[in-house]
């Protein structure tokens, strides 16, 4: 039933604009001048990775990246639709380009990503300065869409694919520190959490060929990168087989199937100096096999982002999270038993979901007290049009109550983060040096295996090297220390 709902609700027809104004092939593939492209990314890490794919697709067509929008011939905003606030941020940003567009009518402004996919044609109607709209699976079509705009027409493609993974595209790294990079391993989500718009903006789950992933990670290591983060809306459900790209899927077990635990091991074996992270995990899919793989390889970071969303079993059922409070707590115990007590665990939490009571809220606070996350991403509920929650449940928790509950969650998380950091004082951690700290060039920073930021004096440090740091102090969000030798 869940598959049918997702199939019914995801629109896959190509928009009329693409067929009405198809430019000639030579207009697309034979650039005569160089154009400056400016890309701004909002939302999750996946959007950052997607923006790097976009730049790679457009470079052969005469586009060069610029880091200032004032110099741009084309501005792309890669958007998020997970909350209303994210979309309002994009609309506000677009309004700031009005004067720029008036001064330069030839400036092309495009909206990419999840907001583009959700609003489709409506976005062109509501935001008059927008020339181009492209969903997450339409980036290969950007040269054609831009040629359509150049011919004097608006352009839109929000086609959702069942196959697209951009596996053959080598991303051009944007704003890179030269140490850490993202690798997209799968796209889409089949989970259908009742509050979430992602299945409708990114489509069905598709796993990328593992050998292309290993190739990309190997090339990054050879270029000097020392950390890769494997990305997906739900990385633990990664599953690839030789039949993945075929329309007819096998009904019996196949040889050559690669699951997420096996992929982790494949990437970890590239080189012991290449750190591996991954995000994001759904609790139902993080198996013991994954946990034992993390334990087996020193270069797979001992850190798991495991969103709980609520500590109330009743609310979790309404959210369609497929687990309850007791099951989630058992999964946390499994992580600490198998990977180790030092494994960093973070979470996502939503305050004020539909019908949430004070008792439900207290269940969330008590779960936090029991687990004591290293850190969390915390928000109050924002109803998203088209989701199951929007269609089935009343958004009946007053905004003031949502904000108060959220603040209580934030306060508790700050307390726990500080307590956990205090316990690290006196310990020595291996830290991957990322470069100068945000506050001072005298101090440098990096992260330990548990994903904690560590700041230390720069004593002839080099980016991309590992140093041992003795933790001497801390703040709520940062460990402070001195470089030492063991």
UniProtKB/Swiss-Prot annotation:
EC number(s) from the headed UniProt entry: 2.8.4.3
Binding residues annotated for [4Fe-4S] cluster 2, in chain numbering: 189, 193, 196
Look up and give the organism this protein is from.
Answer: Amoebophilus asiaticus (strain 5a2)
Designated name of the protein = tRNA-2-methylthio-N(6)-dimethylallyladenosine synthase
**Function, please?**
Catalyzes the methylthiolation of N6-(dimethylallyl)adenosine (i(6)A), leading to the formation of 2-methylthio-N6-(dimethylallyl)adenosine (ms(2)i(6)A) at position 37 in tRNAs that read codons beginning with uridine.
Primary localization: cytoplasm
* HAMAP family the UniProt entry points to: tRNA_metthiotr_MiaB
Q: Which residues form a coiled coil?
A: none
Free-text comment on the cofactor:
Binds 2 [4Fe-4S] clusters. One cluster is coordinated with 3 cysteines and an exchangeable S-adenosyl-L-methionine.
The catalysed reaction is:
N(6)-dimethylallyladenosine(37) in tRNA + (sulfur carrier)-SH + AH2 + 2 S-adenosyl-L-methionine = 2-methylsulfanyl-N(6)-dimethylallyladenosine(37) in tRNA + (sulfur carrier)-H + 5'-deoxyadenosine + L-methionine + A + S-adenosyl-L-homocysteine + 2 H(+)
Q: Which PROSITE patterns match?
A: MTTASE_N (PS51449), MTTASE_RADICAL (PS01278), RADICAL_SAM (PS51918), TRAM (PS50926)
GO terms, molecular function: 4 iron, 4 sulfur cluster binding; metal ion binding; N6-isopentenyladenosine methylthiotransferase activity
Keywords associated with the record:
4Fe-4S, Cytoplasm, Iron, Iron-sulfur, Metal-binding, S-adenosyl-L-methionine, Transferase, tRNA processing
Q: Which SMART domains does the record associate with it?
A: Elp3
Which domain of life does the UniProt lineage start with? Bacteria
| Stretch forming the signal peptide | none
Q: Where in the cell is it found?
A: Cytoplasm
Q: Where is the Radical SAM core domain?
A: 175-419
Lineage, broadest ranks: Bacteria, Pseudomonadati, Bacteroidota, Cytophagia, Cytophagales
Q: Which residues form the MTTase N-terminal domain?
A: 35-151
Q: Which SUPFAM superfamilies match?
A: Radical SAM enzymes
| Cofactors required | [4Fe-4S] cluster
């Amino acid at each position: 039933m869940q598959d049918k709902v997702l199939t019914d609700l995801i629109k896959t027809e190509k928009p009329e604009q693409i067929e009405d104004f198809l430019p000639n092939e030579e207009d697309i593939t034979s650039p005569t001048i160089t154009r400056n492209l400016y890309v701004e990314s909002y939302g999750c890490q996946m959007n950052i990775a997607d923006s790097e794919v976009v730049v790679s697709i457009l470079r052969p067509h005469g586009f060069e990246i610029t880091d200032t929008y004032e110099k741009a011939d084309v501005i792309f905003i890669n958007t998020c639709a997970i909350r209303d606030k994210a979309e309002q941020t994009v609309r506000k940003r677009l309004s700031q380009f009005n004067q720029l567009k008036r001064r330069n009518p030839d400036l092309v402004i495009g909206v990419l990503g999840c907001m583009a996919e959700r609003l489709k044609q409506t976005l062109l109607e509501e935001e008059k300065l927008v020339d181009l709209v492209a969903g997450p699976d339409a980036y290969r079509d950007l040269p054609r869409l831009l040629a359509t705009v150049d011919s004097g027409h608006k352009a839109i493609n929000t086609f959702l694919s069942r196959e697209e993974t951009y596996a053959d595209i080598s991303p051009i790294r944007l704003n890179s520190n030269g140490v850490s990079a993202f690798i997209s391993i799968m796209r889409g989500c089949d989970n259908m959490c009742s509050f979430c718009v992602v299945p409708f903006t990114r489509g069905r789950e598709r796993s990328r060929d593992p050998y292309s992933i290993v190739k990309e990670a190997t090339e990054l290591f050879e270029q000097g990168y020392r950390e890769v983060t494997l990305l997906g809306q739900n990385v633990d459900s990664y599953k690839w087989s030789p039949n993945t790209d075929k329309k007819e899927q096998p009904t019996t077990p196949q040889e050559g199937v690669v699951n997420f635990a096996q992929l982790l091991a494949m990437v970890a074996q590239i080189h012991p100096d290449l750190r591996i992270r991954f995000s994001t995990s759904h609790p139902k899919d993080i198996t013991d096999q994954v946990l034992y793989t993390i334990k087996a390889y020193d270069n797979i970071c001992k850190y798991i982002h495991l969103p709980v969303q609520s500590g109330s079993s009743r609310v979790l059922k309404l959210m369609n999270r497929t687990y309850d409070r007791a099951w989630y707590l058992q999964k946390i115990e499994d992580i600490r038993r198998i990977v180790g007590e030092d494994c960093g665990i973070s979470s996502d939490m939503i305050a004020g979901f539909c019908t949430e009571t004070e008792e439900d809220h207290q269940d969330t606070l008590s779960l936090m007290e029991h687990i004591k996350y290293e850190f969390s991403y915390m928000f109050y509920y924002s109803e998203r049009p088209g989701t199951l929650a929007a269609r089935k449940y009343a958004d009946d928790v007053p905004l003031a109550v949502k904000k108060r509950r959220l603040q209580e969650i934030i306060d508790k998380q700050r307390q726990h983060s500080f307590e956990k950091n205090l316990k690290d004082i006196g310990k020595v951690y291996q830290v991957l040096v990322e470069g100068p700290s945000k506050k001072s060039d005298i101090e440098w920073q990096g992260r330990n295996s548990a994903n904690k930021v560590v700041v230390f004096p720069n004593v002839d440090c080099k980016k991309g090297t590992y140093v041992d740091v003795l933790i001497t102090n801390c703040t709520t969000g940062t460990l402070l220390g001195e470089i030492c030798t063991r």
